[in-house]
Amino acid sequence: MFQELKNKYLATLKSSETEDWLDYRVIRPLCYFLAVFFAKLNIHPNAVTIASMFIGAASSIFFYHGSFYYEGWSGLWLNIIGVLLLCVADLLDCTDGQLARLTGKKSRLGRILDGMAGFTWFIPIYVLLMFRFYQHHSLEFGWLGIPDTEQNALIATAVVTALALYSGFACMGPQQRLADYYIQIHLFMLKGEKGSELDSSEQQQKAYDETPSEGNRLWKYFLKTYIDYTRKQENSTPQFQQLVKLLREKYGSAGNMPAEVRQELLRESRFLMPWNALLTFNFRCGMFFLFCLIDLPLANFLFEIICLGLLTLWINRHHEACCKKVREKVQTP
C-alpha cells in the first residue's frame, strides 16, 4: 500500500532531479495530499494558483511592520504571520502543478498563471518594504554613522527604492525566469517533449496570431505576456537556441538527438540543478525571511543583486559553454 501511494505521489512530480531536498522530502508530499483533496472537491488547478496569488500578496501587509528590534514581540509575530502566509502561497503554487498532472487538467493558461504567481507576491511586498525602510532605518543609519534626519531618511529611501526596483525587475524576475527555463530544458533532455513544458516564443506567437480578438482580449493579453516571457528566456540562452536549431536540422527534431548527445547534456545539467535550485523559491525566500525577521530587509535587495546575480551569471555561462561544446561536436562530420 505504501509503495502504491509512493508511486502515485511520484507520478505527480515533473522529476525528482529538478526538486531540492526540502521540496522533495517535505513540500511536495504535502502538496500531493492537498492535490488529492482538491481533486475530490473538483477544484481546478488554476483556481488554486489564483488563491496563492491573493494569499502571497496579502503577506506584504505583515512584512510592512518592523520586526522585534523596532516593534517588539508584536512586530516579530506580524512578520512571522507574513512568513507563514507566503509559505502557504508557495504550498498552493506547488500544488497546482501536481493537481494538474493528477487530474489531467493541464492548460497553457495554467502555465502562464504559474509563471505570474511569484510576481504578484513580490511586487506588493517590495513596495511595502520601501515604506518599511522609511519608517525603520536606525540600524543601518547607526552602522553607517548617518544622522537620522528627515532629509537623510528621504534620500536613503530613494536609494533603497532604486535598489528594490533593480532587485525585483532586473534580478529576481530574470533569475527565476532563467531558473525555470533550465528546469524545463532538463526535463526535455530527461523525458522528451511530452515530459516538459519547454515552450518557444515562435509557437506562442503562432497561437496568438491564430486566436481571434473578438471575445478573447484577456486571453490574448495573457498570451502576449507569455510570448515576452519565453522570448526573454530564449534571448538569455543563445547557444542553447543554436544547438536546438542544429538538432532539428540534422535529426528532424531536437527530441531525436543521439543518445550520447542527450547523456552529455544531461550530465552537465545534473551538475547545475542543485545550484539552479538556489535561484528558486526555497533558498531565496529563506534568506528573505531571515532578513525581515532580523530587521534588515535592505540586505535582501543587496543579496539578490550581488550574490544571486553572480550565481545566475555563472550558471548561465556554464550551461551556454556546454551547449556550444556539444553543438561543435554535432557539427563535426
PLM features per residue range, with description:
Residues 54, 58, 113-128, 191-201, ...:
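Small-residue-rich segments of transmembrane alpha-helices in multi-pass membrane proteins
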